[in-house]
UniProtKB/Swiss-Prot annotation:
Disulfide bonds: 42-131, 44-60, 59-111, 65-138, 66-104, 73-97, 91-102
Broad EC category: hydrolase
Official protein name in the record: Basic phospholipase A2 Pla2Vb
Leader peptide range in chain numbering: 1-16
Pfam family, one: Phospholip_A2_1
Additional comment: Is not neurotoxic.
Tissue specificity field: Expressed by the venom gland.
Keyword Lipid metabolism recorded: yes
EC number of the protein: 3.1.1.4
Entries under InterPro entries matching the protein: PLipase_A2, PLipase_A2_Asp_AS, PLipase_A2_dom, PLipase_A2_dom_sf, PLipase_A2_His_AS
Length: 138
């Protein structure tokens, strides 16, 4: 179900946070976010449970935790300001929800870049039935 929802949002071209996050990932990693990170491990994609399977999956776990701290915000749909400067992502909003959400996405995109060598195809389309261990705390 999580796959269908995110793909549907992606195909509609929503000009919201999920689109922006995907753009950050594409820029930093050079991979298409949906095809590379959707349903990867226990945390990349919609929802998450269990223990992260590798450093790439941990990037998604930390991203989920960051979104969880976005109290009163709508992290999946809010549109924020950002740009790329000298290979870096720079968030434009100075305060509040939009800044927090942008920073969550920026940190995750950089995490994916730093951990590209841990990406393992065996965790792509990973079954949630393999994610039954107790979750780490945020």
């Amino acid at each position: 179900m999580r796959t269908l929802w995110i793909v549907a949002v992606w195909l509609m071209g929503v000009e919201g946070n999920l689109f922006q996050f995907g753009n950050m990932i594409n820029h930093m990693v050079g991979k298409h976010a949906v095809w590379s990170y959707l349903s990867y491990g226990c945390y990349c994609g919609w929802g998450g449970q269990g223990k992260p399977q590798d450093a790439t999956d941990r990037c998604c776990f930390v991203h989920d935790c960051c979104y969880g701290r976005a109290n009163g915000c709508d992290p999946k749909l809010s549109t924020y300001s950002y740009n790329f400067q000298n290979g870096n992502i720079v968030c434009g909003n100075k305060y509040g929800c939009l800044r927090h959400i942008c920073e969550c996405d920026r940190v995750a995109a950089i995490c994916f870049q730093k951990n590209m060598n841990t990406y393992n195809k065996k965790y792509k389309n990973y079954s949630s039935s393999n994610c039954q261990e107790n979750s780490d705390k945020c």
